[in-house]
From Swiss-Prot:
This protein's name: Uncharacterized 34.6 kDa protein
Domain of life assignment: Viruses
Biased composition (Basic and acidic residues): 1-19
Annotated segments matching region Disordered: 1-20
Amino acid sequence: MATKRAHPEDETHESKRAAQETQLLPYNGSGFLMQVENDGALRKFTPINAMRAQQNLSWQCLVLLNCQALDFSAINFHYGDLQYLKDKFTELQNLSNYYEWRKQERPEDKVCIMEAAVGKCTYTIGLRVKGRPNGFAIAEFGSVHRSKSTFGQFLSTTWSAIHEHNSVFGKIMDSYYKHEYPLKLESSVCVHLPEKDYEREIKARQFLWVRRDNNPELYATGQLDRPLEVAPMTLAEFDRLFEVNKTDGPSQEVPVLVCGRIDGVKYGKEIQMTDVNGRKFSEKPYSLAFKPVLYLILEP
């Protein structure tokens, strides 16, 4: 049987229909562009002023974007007692950029996993290099507070995008180990807080104040046209801010811009649970293996 030949007008009509489905259309004066797909069954909306909004970002967001690009030139460290920041910046710059990695096609295909060694509790996850997997640098707005457990005091850090990061690394673990149940990571990460003053002072110097008094032009104009002037936190300021001598309950939440590294996923001590049928079982809590490198405290 002869095959029916497509009419040129049919081909033209089909190409026009496809073009109409994929073009962006202003929708009803709403400030959005509408993209129609799947014969009109799927409609995607994108803000028209997305690019305009980027041009009007606050100076705080511009600092964040600089840090996410691993460009720390927006922080003035070129004098005296701030030279140690250069080593902090280099540590972050030697890691893989998380945000650039996520833009790649099939980014998970480029990572490798190193299982936890005997006596350790971290599955190392990172881009494949000649050596150990190379972890990821991130920068996010978040908060930190001091808390206490049977193992001593610790700093608990969280950030708005931690749920996205948990999902990414949880899926990597799921695809590798194929557990019966999906992996659920904790919504904060904890770092031990030492008791000795000299050790806690090292921790305090990870916190940098960005104050109005040191950046008058920035706060007056809202324009980031020069590097931030920062001041490292003293031990006395650290202990006061995080209420180290408080005997019960956590300290207040401190808003921060945190820069750090994700080196994989770690697990804690097993916890006992019971299902709805009364069967007892144990599971280990999992969280991101996250190491904070710097905290910026931006005075409002």
